[in-house]
Amino acid sequence: MSKETFQRNKPHINIGTIGHVDHGKTTLTAAITRALSGDGLADFRDYSSIDNTPEEKARGITINASHVEYETPNRHYAHVDCPGHADYVKNMITGAAQMDGAILVVSATDGAMPQTKEHILLARQVGVPYIVVFLNKIDMISEEDAELVDLVEMELSELLEEKGYKGCPIIRGSALKALEGDAAYIEKVRELMQAVDDNIPTPEREIDKPFLMPIEDVFSISGRGTVVTGRIERGIVKVSDKVQLVGLRDTKETIVTGVEMFRKELPEGRAGENVGLLLRGIGKNDVERGMVVCLPNSVKPHTQFKCAVYVLQKEEXGRHKPFFTGYRPQFFFRTTDVTGVVTLPEGVEMVMPGDNVEFEVQLISPVALEEGMRFAIREGGRTIGAGTISKIIA
């Protein structure tokens, strides 16, 4: 079945496999394509084709990730699988593959391991809203050890609940056996995908959210007024809509008197489109790149937040030395850099290149911020880290 024949008449969901190294994430990804290919809903992808991951860049950071697509009878899925732990951290923090939900793969023989816990915490920090658990390698458990699996399940449920993931379904199976064609275990993979269908809700589409456009450029057109250009991040804007300009200065309200695309007048602009908006009563000096134009009161300007951050290693062209509380890099949000001061949490003396850390930031100017938003950290124009806002403070 070629890529082109995938019909887009089903809701689209982004998911990924997360979990400890060697617990079977990639094997499960391959097993899902095997199970669904039997129903003509996927192209079978073997382990090596998924494991051999291409490099991609997100927010100036190189990430290895494999993208697989498949369908269930109800939905179309894009599934991301990463080879190494550092790639998961980078992938989740940069939002390279924004996940609507995740499949947490845990080996029944090992139970929850350090990276299991780290991935659950990371999922919470970056705003992955739902998790479904696949308890893998169940074929390795002898009958006398069967009770241990119940304990592993209990421990997992507690661990997930601690981080705010309540009542996650847990499906037992064997990815390897399913991949080898064992019918009973293929059925378990189908059961897993049914649980994913049922427990990971379809996200609200970008077009249905409140209007927001980051401003990339500002022009003044003589006799007509000021035009701001950018790519609409979400929602719809129509001529004569009331909007606000938020960030960098005091919030201003104005009215959209024109929407243009490729020099043509349009009645409206929609999520994903590059447009110019003509704004009533706004001078060229009242507005600048880095502000957003949005539905009134849908976004507020903020200066202080907590964030989950990945700091690039030297080999990834990051810093060569650690940084400390008081460090003042630039934080790049949407279309602009703003200087901010870092405060490390108690007990953390310094941050080394390659670390994955949570800290607070105080910006010198207000920016339109929201929890779950991604940003890059830059020094002199080069990226040295990436982050996600986990909590707005002020």
Swiss-Prot record:
Coiled coil: none annotated. Residues 136-139 are annotated as: G4. One of its GO terms (molecular function) is GTPase activity. It catalyses: GTP + H2O = GDP + phosphate + H(+). Gene3D superfamilies: P-loop containing nucleotide triphosphate hydrolases, Translation factors. The keyword Cytoplasm applies. InterPro entries: EF-Tu_GTP-bd, EF-Tu_GTPase, EFTu-like_2, EFTU_2, G_TR_CS, P-loop_NTPase, Small_GTP-bd, T_Tr_GTP-bd_dom. The keyword Iron-sulfur does not apply. GTP hydrolase that promotes the GTP-dependent binding of aminoacyl-tRNA to the A-site of ribosomes during protein biosynthesis. Monomer. This is Elongation factor Tu. It comes from Chlamydia muridarum (strain MoPn / Nigg). The gene is tuf.
